[in-house]
Regions:
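A charged, amphipathic alpha-helical module
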Residues: 1-2, 35
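Segments forming glycine/polar-rich beta-alpha architectures that bind adenosine-containing cofactors
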Residues: 19-52, 56-61, 65-68
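Secondary-structure capping and boundary motifs in well-ordered enzyme cores
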Residues: 52, 59-62, 104, 109, ...
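Ferredoxin-type iron-sulfur electron-transfer modules in oxidoreductases and energy-metabolism complexes
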Residues: 33-52, 78-110, 139-151, 156, ...
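Iron-sulfur cluster-binding cysteine motifs and their immediate structural context
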Residues: 39-41, 65-84, 103, 113, ...
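Acidic catalytic cores of enzymes that act on phosphate-bearing nucleotides/polynucleotides
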Residues: 6-20
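Short, small-residue-biased leader/transition segments that mark boundaries at the very start
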Residues: 3-4, 165-166
């Protein structure tokens, strides 16, 4: 919407670039109450972490604990159809999904958003695998994972969990 574009392009990007002091007071006339439109944090890809988690497809037990504990939702599990997996980027490694019934037809991937990650390492600490499925690596070595994150966000929401819940 126009509200998002105006706020993100005219205010948020300048503030994030440390140029907020160049903004005229008139830039804030639509926000006199100090509010910001909901959802604009999706545009704040700051890349502030020194180190970010790297997922090891060969060590993951698919427990999703890393995703549960991430305070910034920067690491998330994804299920893919065979077709989606075939169309994934070459660096997009997947596993056969663990589980019963309908889940078995999917592929699994744990994906990190390197630009949203704050580098706290809580995900690594929470990993219960005997050999940790996540290790911290320098952000600059993982920037290519942003393409994988962007691909993950295009995946269909194909799984119905209603019959799997208690």
């Amino acid at each position: 919407s126009d509200v998002y574009k105006r706020q993100v392009n005219n205010i948020q990007k300048k503030i994030n670039a440390q140029m907020g002091n160049t903004l005229p007071v008139s830039a804030f006339k639509d926000y006199v109450d100090g509010s910001t439109p909901s959802g604009t944090s999706a545009y704040e890809k700051r890349g502030v972490a020194v180190d970010v988690p790297v997922w090891d497809v060969n060590k993951c037990i698919q427990c999703n604990q890393c995703s549960y504990v991430c305070p910034h939702a920067a690491i998330r599990p994804f299920l893919l159809t065979e077709e989606e997996a075939a169309n994934a980027p070459a660096s997009y490694a997947v596993l056969d999904a663990n589980g019963a019934g309908e889940i078995k037809q999917y592929k699994f991937r744990m994906q990190v958003d390197p630009l949203d990650c704050q580098g706290c390492g809580v995900c690594v600490t929470a990993c219960p695998a005997k050999e940790k499925a996540l290790v911290m690596q320098p952000l600059e070595t993982q920037l290519h994972e942003q393409d994988n994150w962007d691909f993950s966000l295009t995946l269909s929401d194909t799984v119905s969990y209603t019959h799997l819940t208690l």
